[in-house]
């Protein structure tokens, strides 16, 4: 039975009938470096040994007494693949920190199917709360105490990480987690979905749709609503309680999720939420193209837009 494939999402992963998962992508890691890379240093922290939850912290090499904006980043991968330590994420966060002159904290949460939804959200929430223990300057991590500006906190992520950023910001307001603490969120090609097309412009490929539905079953096997689960069908939920003042949604023209991103922004505008939302669309590009081709002009524009949003 261990050799019988139950769900094949190559080239990303395979799940066998025994329950075993074979991750084909996103398992390579790169170490942090106190030797500057592109003017940025980094280190890893285990902040919850009992759950083995860790973070990678990035800091500009040349820092002054001036506090820096804090970027808390959640990686993508459908809640199943990739880590905060994957080479594409290390490269992207290094570039983002160099451009925005910010302090970045890249969160490594536990993944499905070993740790199914909602565990990735709970791990991310715990990581956010750990970061906030540094508000008074007496937290366990010196870099955050010394250099982090808690008046400028941004949550960001791509794909599943964008999904996580939305849900944490909703929860932060609902649970009154330091009112008005989160300045804004940056959702890059957010992983939102629904059972039926979100609008008349959403064109669905049958094979890709089955891939999304199957992947969600792997990530959230106990979901009774399937892809209409509120964790995933974000556009079908009420976003008016979003706990930040500004939102940037980045979408890619050839991405399966492009209309979800646009409709999320439109719904946010009409919901009664009183913040500002903007959308940046990159034409003729696919899902997370900026991670796959980080040296392309379009990828550089993603970093530039992120920098502008943080430092506005």
UniProtKB/Swiss-Prot annotation:
Expressed in leaves, stems, flowers and siliques. The active site is at residues 159, 255, 287. This is Probable carboxylesterase 7. Belongs to the 'GDXG' lipolytic enzyme family. Its EC number is 3.1.1.1. The modification N-acetylmethionine is found at residue 1. Gene3D superfamilies: alpha/beta hydrolase (3.40.50.1820). SUPFAM superfamilies: alpha/beta-Hydrolases (SSF53474). It is an enzyme of class 3 (hydrolase). Keywords: Acetylation, Hydrolase, Serine esterase. Carboxylesterase acting on esters with varying acyl chain length. It catalyses: a carboxylic ester + H2O = an alcohol + a carboxylate + H(+). One of its GO terms (molecular function) is carboxylesterase activity. The lineage of its organism: Eukaryota, Viridiplantae, Streptophyta, Embryophyta, Tracheophyta. Coiled coil: none annotated. A motif (Involved in the stabilization of the negatively charged intermediate by the formation of the oxyanion hole) lies at residues 75-77.
């Amino acid at each position: 039975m261990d050799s019988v494939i139950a769900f094949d999402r190559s080239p990303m992963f395979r799940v066998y009938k025994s329950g075993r998962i074979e991750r084909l992508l996103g398992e390579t890691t790169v170490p942090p470096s106190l030797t500057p890379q592109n003017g940025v240093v980094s280190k890893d922290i285990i902040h919850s040994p009992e759950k083995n939850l860790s973070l990678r912290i990035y800091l500009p090499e040349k820092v002054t007494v001036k506090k820096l904006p804090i970027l808390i980043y959640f990686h993508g991968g459908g809640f199943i693949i990739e880590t905060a330590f994957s080479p594409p994420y290390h490269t992207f966060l290094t570039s983002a920190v160099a451009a925005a002159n910010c302090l970045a904290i890249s969160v490594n949460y536990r993944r499905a199917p070993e740790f199914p939804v909602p565990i990735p959200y709970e791990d991310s929430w715990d990581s956010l709360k750990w970061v906030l223990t540094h508000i008074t300057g007496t937290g366990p991590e010196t870099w955050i105490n010394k250099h982090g500006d808690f008046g400028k906190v941004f949550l960001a992520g791509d794909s599943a990480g964008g999904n996580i950023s939305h849900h944490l910001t909703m929860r932060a307001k609902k649970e009154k987690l330091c009112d008005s603490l989160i300045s804004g969120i940056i959702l890059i090609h957010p992983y939102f979905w629904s059972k039926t097309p979100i609008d008349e412009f959403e064109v669905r490929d049958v094979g890709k749709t089955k891939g999304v539905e199957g992947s969600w079953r792997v990530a959230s096997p106990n979901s009774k609503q399937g892809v209409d689960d509120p964790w995933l069908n974000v556009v079908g939920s009420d976003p008016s309680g979003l706990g930040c003042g500004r939102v940037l949604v980045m979408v890619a023209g050839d991405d399966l999720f492009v209309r979800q991103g646009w409709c999320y922004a439109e719904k946010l505008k009409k919901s009664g939420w009183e913040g500002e939302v903007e959308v940046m669309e990159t034409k003729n590009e696919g899902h997370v193209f900026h991670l796959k081709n980080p040296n392309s002009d379009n990828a550089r524009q993603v970093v530039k837009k992120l920098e502008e949003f943080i430092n506005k």
